[in-house]
Design a protein with these regions (language model features):
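GH16 jelly-roll
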Residues: 19-290
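Sec/Tat signal peptide C-region and signal peptidase I cleavage site
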Residues: 14-18
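Sec-dependent N-terminal signal peptides
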Residues: 4-12
Length: 290
C-alpha cells in the first residue's frame, strides 16, 4: 500500500510539472525576455543582465549579456542568472553561447558559466543536468548531473579537454567532497573523443545541447565548421544519476572561490573585471515521454 501511494504521488507530482512543458526558443533580440525571469540573488547592478545587446564579435547578432559584478560574493546564483518561468522535463535542450576570455586580464580568476536545469523538490530531491565552463581554461568542459536529497547528493560527471580530445574523468561521487568512482562499460561512452584543434569556448560562439530521457542523457555540441553533432557523453546503462522529475531551465555566471580548473589550481581569485558572457539563444523541445 505504501508503495502504491508513493507511485501515485509521484505520478500526480510529475503530471503537475509536465503540463507546463511547451517548446520554445528564446532569441534574446529584445530587452524583454519571454520565457525566463531574473534569478540572481546578488547585487542589483543594472549592467549585470541585459537582453537585445549587440554581440562583441558578431555585429549582426543580438545577445543576452551577462556581466560579473566585482562586488558580488562567491556562490552560484550571486552573479547574473535567468530561470525558466515554467518547468521543463524530458526533451532536447540547446543553446548558442560564447564565454569570456579572461586569460590575459586575470588568468587566475575563479568564475563559472553554467548552462543547466535545476530544481530542488522537497520530496523528490534535486533534478539538475549541466554544462559548466571555468574561465581560467576555456578548452575544458564539465558535463553531468546532480540528484538526491540535500546532504545526500550524488554526482555523475565527465570532464573533457576538447582541444586535445582528452577525457580527464568520467565518474560518480557522493556530495561535493566525495571520492570519484570511475565509470566503465555503457556508462563510459564514447570512450574516446576526436579533438577540435582550435576549440576555445571564449573565442567564438558554439552550439551546445543535451537530450534528456528517462533512461539516458546525451551531451553534445555542433562542430563549428561542419555542423556535425559531436557526442561528448552518452550516459546510459544505469538509472543512477538520471533525474526523473521536472526542473527549471537556467543560465548563470558566478564567482567560485572553492573550485579551480584542473589545469590551474590557483584559479580561485575574486573577479577584478566585469567579464561578459554572451548568449545568442536558448531552446527547449519536449519529448513524447513528457
Amino acid at each position: 500500500m505504501k508503495q502504491l501511494f508513493f507511485l501515485n504521488f509521484l505520478f500526480v507530482t510529475q503530471s503537475a510539472y509536465s503540463q507546463n512543458s511547451v517548446a520554445f526558443k528564446e532569441e534574446f533580440t529584445q530587452p524583454g525576455i519571454e520565457n525566463f525571469i531574473n534569478g540572481a540573488t546578488g547585487t542589483k547592478a543594472v549592467f549585470k543582465s541585459n537582453s537585445g545587446v549587440q554581440s562583441s564579435i558578431e555585429k549582426e547578432t543580438s545577445i543576452l549579456s551577462f556581466k560579473l559584478d566585482t562586488n558580488d560574493a562567491a556562490g552560484a546564483g550571486r552573479g547574473p542568472e535567468i530561470i525558466s518561468k515554467n518547468f521543463t522535463h524530458f526533451g532536447s535542450y540547446s543553446a548558442r553561447l560564447k564565454i569570456p576570455d579572461a586569460r590575459e586580464l586575470q588568468p587566475n580568476v575563479g568564475a563559472v558559466v553554467g548552462y543547466f536545469t535545476y530544481h530542488a523538490d522537497k520530496d523528490l530531491g534535486l533534478s539538475e543536468i549541466d554544462f559548466e565552463w571555468l574561465l581560467a581554461d576555456p578548452n575544458i568542459i564539465y558535463v553531468g548531473t546532480w540528484t538526491g536529497q540535500k546532504g545526500k547528493l550524488e554526482r555523475i560527471g565527465r570532464t573533457i579537454n576538447l582541444k586535445t580530445g582528452e577525457i580527464l574523468s568520467t565518474a560518480f561521487r557522493s556530495n561535493h567532497d566525495g571520492v570519484n568512482h570511475p565509470f566503465s562499460g555503457r556508462q563510459n561512452k564514447p570512450k574516446k573523443l576526436s579533438k577540435i584543434e582550435d576549440y576555445d569556448a571564449s573565442a567564438r560562439f558554439y552550439t551546445y545541447g543535451f537530450d534528456w530521457h528517462s533512461d539516458r542523457i546525451t551531451w553534445w555540441l555542433l562542430h563549428p565548421k561542419s555542423g556535425r553533432k559531436i557526442v561528448l557523453w552518452d550516459y546510459k546503462g544505469s538509472s543512477m544519476g538520471i533525474p526523473l522529475h521536472a526542473s527549471k531551465y537556467r543560465m548563470n555566471f558566478w564567482h567560485a572561490n572553492n573550485w579551480a580548473v584542473e589545469t590551474n589550481p590557483r584559479s580561485l581569485e575574486k573577479p577584478k573585471y566585469n567579464f561578459e558572457l554572451e548568449v545568442d539563444w536558448m531552446s527547449y523541445k519536449p519529448s513524447k515521454e513528457d
